[in-house]
Swiss-Prot record:
Stimulates the transcription of various genes by recognizing and binding to a CCAAT motif in promoters. This is Nuclear transcription factor Y subunit A-8. GO terms for cellular component: CCAAT-binding factor complex. Belongs to the NFYA/HAP2 subunit family. Expressed in the whole plant, except roots. It comes from Arabidopsis thaliana. Its main location: nucleus. Residues 205-230 bind DNA.
């Protein structure tokens, strides 16, 4: 005999949400004449869908109680007229319902300890089991509370730390230069031979003497920590380097003119300037630019002073040409 099972759902979206489900069943004996019922209540746990509920009722009844099931289904449909709902009715064979009842009875019989006592407890006091379904709904974007989210355990590889062995440094290979390998092995063999003969090994000299260390601390260092060159440091502090090059040559030329004036002061009898004097004066002219000097000669009766104007120009093919005008 077929049994009619009605399924009523008031879900607005097709995507299965997070569900909180409770199942209660009562399995009375057939002698009492009470209908066997199995109800499954599915509650939508979303905040905006807490008002809407899902009721799934499975009723197992005889042909005489078909009218009452039809009335109950009509009541559920009338109560859900305000919200859009869908109602699905299908037929289930009696063998499937009987198999479900037998599996539930066996489970409770194992928990109680004896099969007869477990079946009696089921008939006397109907039990209730609660469980929840976790569905990954991507449409909410993580707005669900933490209680409804699946608790996934993530193992970080940095969280687990393994202690290192104590003899790790001793067993590790030492990488040395290929050219120094033979000398290192020779010294180690010689040291091992002396230790086997119980001979005293001389104390090794320190890597750096203390005086050298103190001297290194006193030496000036640059920004990168390297030692500065003292010669370059002295050249940078030399005051002559601060003067421009033309000014240095001008001071040298002035000293030459003073020497020429002293030489001419010894000859007091001269009244005119010879050609050789003019030539010597031309050598002392500044070769790097235009200059004008005043030279005082020895006093004479006709010309008490002598003016020498010198001009040099090195722009003509790299040769030095001199132009002088002597006023007596």
């Amino acid at each position: 005999m077929d049994k009619k099972v009605s399924f009523t759902s008031s879900v607005a979206h097709s995507t299965p949400p997070y569900l909180s489900t409770s199942i209660s069943w009562g399995l009375p004996t057939k002698s009492n004449g009470v209908t066997e019922s199995l109800s499954l209540k599915v509650v939508d746990a979303r905040p905006e869908r807490l008002i809407n509920t899902k009721n799934i009722s499975f009723q197992d009844q005889d042909s005489s109680s078909t009218l009452s099931s039809a009335q109950s289904s009509n009541d559920v449909t009338s109560s859900g007229d305000d919200n859009p709902s869908r109602q699905i009715s299908f037929l289930a064979h009696s063998d499937v319902c009987k198999g479900f009842e037998e599996t539930q009875r066996k489970r409770f019989a194992i928990k109680s300890g004896s099969s007869t006592a477990g079946i009696a407890d089921i008939h006397s006091s109907p039990s209730k089991a609660n469980f929840s379904f976790h569905y990954a709904d991507p449409h909410f974007g993580g707005l669900m509370p933490a209680a409804y989210l699946p608790q996934a355990t993530i193992w970080n590889p940095q969280m687990t730390r393994v202690p290192l062995p104590f003899d790790l440094i001793e067993n590790e290979p030492v990488f040395v230069n290929a050219k120094q390998f033979h000398a290192i092995m020779r010294r180690r063999q010689q040291r091992a031979k002396l230790e086997a003969q119980n001979k005293l090994i001389k104390a090794r000299k320190p890597y750096l003497h203390e005086s050298r260390h103190v001297h290194a601390l006193k030496r000036p260092r640059g920004s990168g920590g390297r030692f500065l060159n003292t010669k370059k440091l002295q050249e940078s502090t030399d005051p002559k380097q601060d003067m421009p090059i033309q000014q240095q040559h001008a001071t040298g030329n002035m000293s030459r003119f003073v020497l020429y004036q002293l030489q001419n002061s010894n000859d007091c009898d001269c009244s005119t300037t010879s050609r050789s004097d003019i030539t010597s004066a031309s050598d002392s002219v500044n070769l790097f630019g235009h200059s004008e000097f005043l030279i005082s000669d020895c006093p004479s009766q006709t010309n008490p002073t002598m003016y020498v104007h010198g001009q040099s120009n090195d722009m003509h093919g790299g040769r030095n040409t001199h132009h002088f005008s002597v006023h007596i």
